[in-house]
Amino acid sequence: MSISIPWRGLRLQLIVVTGCLLAMVAMIVTSPSQLRYDEHNHIGLTQLVATNGWRDALLSPENRSAAGPLYPAIHLMLSPITHLQPPAIRWVNFGCFLGVVLLLARCKPVEPVAPRLLSGFTLLAVPFLWPAVGMALTELPALLFFTCFVLLFLRLIDSDVVLSPGTFGLAFLAGLCLGAAILGRQTYLVVVPALVVLMFWLREKWSSVLICIINSLAACSWLFVLWHGLAPPHYYRIAESSGSFANLLFSLSYAAAATLFLNPAWLLRQRVTVWIISTLCGFALSYFARNYESPPAKSLLVHTFGNQFGLWIGFVVGCVLATIGVVWAWTTFKTFWRKRRDPGQVFLLLSLGALVLAPMKMTAQFSSRYIVGCLGVLFLVVGAPLESRRYWAARMFVGSVLGTAILWTYFQQS
């Protein structure tokens, strides 16, 4: 039986995406039957909730998870199926990832469904997404609700100017989804100030935006009242300073790296002057701000090349990524200025900028998983075109191989 019309020109893309998904499935199926890495902390919170109830669990000194209640709520709901045991619990994030791809496809309804879906799966080309998808971590459930918020808010922007029952419903549901995302990862709280700024672009719809903001805060503020802060009380003993420029540099670098895998043309088409200035700035910032002992993809590099050589390679790679990060920041600003009259693009760019800046306040450590939370809006901003089939397939292959290797190193950590 022949492939249906919409898929005929997309055979290569379909084969590549299927291969990447099968690789992810194989990694989960063969994953350890013990909890690994931060799964201990997050499943530990879930078990505390089941034993002690929500309030006591969220305030308990035994809670080593800094995330909110969305993750344990989802895993408790699915516990009759997963029994809170690996590898079954890891399928939850895989399902959330499929949901994210479907929602991103809905954000571009003017295009045929086949290219939209395959383009969404280009996210698997981003190597540091693989641990978040293949393990029972907190990023994907929150990303699913945040992507739902983005879809609803974009529809709100395109809706009628007057506050009709339809726009009220969109604003209410969008706020509810954003609040749920914040309950999954507090990082999404930075989108609320972005919505406040966005009201200057949506003056005729300010009431709808305000409803969205109020509902999102109503959905999540109880948690911060309970904690008397943005994280559990014990977490503040870990964080020592008020900000980290090194984390900001890491964040820009990882956002740039993700863009290179999604759509390198969006980033690389710059004048020579921009590259020269960015290279000087990137290496200077890396020298003064980066920690030599904490390079990008440290686990993979140390496992592959040994401690000393792996750290040296990581520092060089970090300098290159810092350069590209500076270029990424400049390109994002240029895109914002060029599309400043498009409320939908302004919304996406403000949200993206806020999420990329947020790790600067996470001073205890930096993790590439912080950038996973902005991959949905990054995808909507930069796109993932399928036209250059061989280059696209090459990026998917390289990214998936690296992602598989990174996920494997995570599975080796007790």
Question: What do the predicted segments below correspond to?
Answer:
Residues R36, P131-A142, F366-S368:
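Short acidic/glycine- and proline-prone juxtamembrane loop motifs at membrane-interface regions
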Residues S119-G120, S164-R185, V192-V197, N215-C220, ...:
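Membrane-interface alpha helices of multi-pass inner-membrane proteins
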Residues A23, H40-I74, I157:
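Extracytosolic helix-loop segments that constitute the early lumenal/periplasmic catalytic or substrate-binding loops
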Residues S65, P69, A73, I81-G99, ...:
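Loop-to-helix entry region of an early transmembrane alpha helix in multi-pass inner-membrane enzymes
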Residues P109-V110, F149-L170, F200-K205, L386:
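Membrane-interface transmembrane helices that cradle and orient dolichyl/undecaprenyl
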Residues P193, V197-G306, G314, L407-Q412:
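Membrane-lumen/periplasm interface segments of specific transmembrane helices
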Residues W91-E111, C148-L152:
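Transmembrane-helix motifs of polytopic, lipid-linked glycan transferases
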Residues Q13, L104-V126, L143-L144, V162-P165:
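Transmembrane-helix signature of polytopic, membrane-embedded enzymes
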